[in-house]
Amino acid sequence: MINIRKTHPLMKILNNAFIDLPTPSNISSWWNFGSLLGLCLIMQILTGLFLAMHYTPDTSTAFSSVAHICRDVNYGWFIRYLHANGASMFFICLYAHIGRGLYYGSYMFQETWNIGVLLLLTVMATAFVGYVLPWGQMSFWGATVITNLLSAIPYIGTTLVEWIWGGFSVDKATLTRFFAFHFILPFIITALAAVHLLFLHETGSNNPTGIPSNMDMIPFHPYYTTKDILGALFLILALLALTLFTPDLLGDPDNYTPANPLSTPAHIKPEWYFLFAYAILRSIPNKLGGVLALLLSILILIFIPMLQTSKQRSMMFRPFSQLLFWTLIADLLTLTWIGGQPVEHPYIIVGQLASILYFLLILVLMPTVSLIENKLLKW
């Protein structure tokens, strides 16, 4: 009798995606982050569901409902901090996943890559609206500053901002709709992730060499299921260590002060995972220019496949491109640091230089160096 997993309509889909899936035999631990992102998403949906059972999306009670979760609900503090730090782990995995794609040329699977960029934008939107929900000072002012950026759009900007706010400032209507968005978006992310996988399984996985591996495939189970479980254990260990030892390490102390529209915090800044984009936004003195640079800093990923000038897909055998790649990583870390600093000398000029270097590396230097490498190899 043929195995049920190969005949049953539902089991067949799961079998072809996670059990009998032909996988390159040489993919490294950098390929673990896809499954880790799936794990993060499941954890965030579960912890978020339990938080939503006790949270009230109302300006007068939101802050105290979060305090109530932490003080009175059984293990509420644990669920809350798992959710908050889970978001940080989500972004760490996300950035590692994108970095892997850039390094090994996975962006040449264009449909998979474009869905991935869409996923990144959706996760960023989810994290942003989620940060507003505790209704602390940084929640309120972060929401005010970021939504206000839309007013830079000519002609319709102001109307658009008031439409998103549901009034003339960030208030009860804004909080209620942000809670609704924060609840629905993870399910949209889940659907997009399924489409992401669908397109990936059309082509099969890339591998570190960037050379097609059709002649050397192994089944996903048990080899990569085991490997993914090990990765998951490390992720859970890191998340638990962060949550149980230093739960507020990555948070902002201002968010322990209830939102007050009459008092502006000294330094308004987003969560750490948005600081690089925030630094690029602030480095341009013009409002519309800043907003466009902010958008382009993320949307530039869509153009990466078009900027591929190398005859080799992966950077594995391209030392000059590797140097530029790690320069880009260092530049992003610099931008992240600058985004958390006050707007004063020397941070302003460092931020501007780092922003220029970011776009210069991606749009000019990397494609040019790839062409030089082709010449050196007489290709």
From Swiss-Prot:
<keyword id="KW-0349">Heme</keyword>
<feature type="binding site" description="axial binding residue">
    <location>
        <position position="196"/>
    </location>
    <ligand>
        <name>heme b b566</name>
    </ligand>
</feature>
<keyword id="KW-0812">Transmembrane</keyword>
<feature type="binding site" description="axial binding residue">
    <location>
        <position position="182"/>
    </location>
    <ligand>
        <name>heme b b562</name>
    </ligand>
</feature>
<keyword id="KW-0496">Mitochondrion</keyword>
<dbReference type="InterPro" id="IPR016174">
    <property type="entry name" value="Di-haem_cyt_TM"/>
</dbReference>
<dbReference type="InterPro" id="IPR005798">
    <property type="entry name" value="Cyt_b/b6_C"/>
</dbReference>
<comment type="function">
    <text>Component of the ubiquinol-cytochrome c reductase complex (complex III or cytochrome b-c1 complex) that is part of the mitochondrial respiratory chain. The b-c1 complex mediates electron transfer from ubiquinol to cytochrome c. Contributes to the generation of a proton gradient across the mitochondrial membrane that is then used for ATP synthesis.</text>
</comment>
<keyword id="KW-0408">Iron</keyword>
<dbReference type="GO" id="GO:0008121">
    <property type="term" value="F:ubiquinol-cytochrome-c reductase activity"/>
</dbReference>
<feature type="binding site" description="axial binding residue">
    <location>
        <position position="83"/>
    </location>
    <ligand>
        <name>heme b b562</name>
    </ligand>
</feature>
<comment type="similarity">
    <text>Belongs to the cytochrome b family.</text>
</comment>
<keyword id="KW-0249">Electron transport</keyword>
<dbReference type="InterPro" id="IPR048260">
    <property type="entry name" value="Cytochrome_b_C_euk/bac"/>
</dbReference>
<dbReference type="GO" id="GO:0046872">
    <property type="term" value="F:metal ion binding"/>
</dbReference>
<dbReference type="GO" id="GO:0005743">
    <property type="term" value="C:mitochondrial inner membrane"/>
</dbReference>
<keyword id="KW-0830">Ubiquinone</keyword>
<keyword id="KW-1133">Transmembrane helix</keyword>
<keyword id="KW-0999">Mitochondrion inner membrane</keyword>
<keyword id="KW-0472">Membrane</keyword>
<feature type="transmembrane region" description="Helical">
    <location>
        <begin position="320"/>
        <end position="340"/>
    </location>
</feature>
<feature type="transmembrane region" description="Helical">
    <location>
        <begin position="178"/>
        <end position="198"/>
    </location>
</feature>
<feature type="transmembrane region" description="Helical">
    <location>
        <begin position="226"/>
        <end position="246"/>
    </location>
</feature>
<dbReference type="InterPro" id="IPR036150">
    <property type="entry name" value="Cyt_b/b6_C_sf"/>
</dbReference>
<dbReference type="Pfam" id="PF00033">
    <property type="entry name" value="Cytochrome_B"/>
</dbReference>
<keyword id="KW-0479">Metal-binding</keyword>
<dbReference type="InterPro" id="IPR027387">
    <property type="entry name" value="Cytb/b6-like_sf"/>
</dbReference>
<dbReference type="InterPro" id="IPR048259">
    <property type="entry name" value="Cytochrome_b_N_euk/bac"/>
</dbReference>
<dbReference type="InterPro" id="IPR005797">
    <property type="entry name" value="Cyt_b/b6_N"/>
</dbReference>
<feature type="transmembrane region" description="Helical">
    <location>
        <begin position="347"/>
        <end position="367"/>
    </location>
</feature>
<comment type="subunit">
    <text>The cytochrome bc1 complex contains 11 subunits: 3 respiratory subunits (MT-CYB, CYC1 and UQCRFS1), 2 core proteins (UQCRC1 and UQCRC2) and 6 low-molecular weight proteins (UQCRH/QCR6, UQCRB/QCR7, UQCRQ/QCR8, UQCR10/QCR9, UQCR11/QCR10 and a cleavage product of UQCRFS1). This cytochrome bc1 complex then forms a dimer.</text>
</comment>
<protein>
    <recommendedName>
        <fullName>Cytochrome b</fullName>
    </recommendedName>
</protein>
<feature type="transmembrane region" description="Helical">
    <location>
        <begin position="33"/>
        <end position="53"/>
    </location>
</feature>
<keyword id="KW-0813">Transport</keyword>
<feature type="binding site">
    <location>
        <position position="201"/>
    </location>
    <ligand>
        <name>a ubiquinone</name>
    </ligand>
</feature>
<feature type="binding site" description="axial binding residue">
    <location>
        <position position="97"/>
    </location>
    <ligand>
        <name>heme b b566</name>
    </ligand>
</feature>
<feature type="transmembrane region" description="Helical">
    <location>
        <begin position="77"/>
        <end position="98"/>
    </location>
</feature>
<dbReference type="InterPro" id="IPR030689">
    <property type="entry name" value="Cytochrome_b"/>
</dbReference>
<feature type="transmembrane region" description="Helical">
    <location>
        <begin position="288"/>
        <end position="308"/>
    </location>
</feature>
<dbReference type="GO" id="GO:0045275">
    <property type="term" value="C:respiratory chain complex III"/>
</dbReference>
<dbReference type="GO" id="GO:0006122">
    <property type="term" value="P:mitochondrial electron transport, ubiquinol to cytochrome c"/>
</dbReference>
<feature type="transmembrane region" description="Helical">
    <location>
        <begin position="113"/>
        <end position="133"/>
    </location>
</feature>
